């Protein structure tokens, strides 16, 4: 049985988890959380997006933030705000420890991945990565006006999946999460 969970949401209000690790990878790996899932008969935990993501400017202008994580900017990095240490880079070790804890409990870890768009938005969005490297190789552009993005995702852009560059990026990312981070599977958004 697969249990879908949000890293922050699963433990943020859980009084059985120490306050300093609630809403983090360490909190998700806390023994009482894993025991609860085992009692339910869960065999795999599916984590909602955990790739590094950014906040949308329109949310920030309203005093809000991107809770769900569907605005990816780093396909090879676990989101650093989910690290209990607060140190950049420590999220990798904490994520790996969480995966090990689930494997020791006989459960698999599945990631909800978002490879159909990025946080760079439309032509007015920020230049954070692929726009600056090779815009036309990574994004679907409007045929008669290549300044604008062909948006099939409702986010301002869509990755160009038939591009060898985009396809290589995605397969390299998937391989990384399996070989280096030891996850067991994926759900594609």
Region locations from a protein language model:
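Basic K/R-rich, polyanion-interacting modules in nucleoproteins and related proteins
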Residues: 1
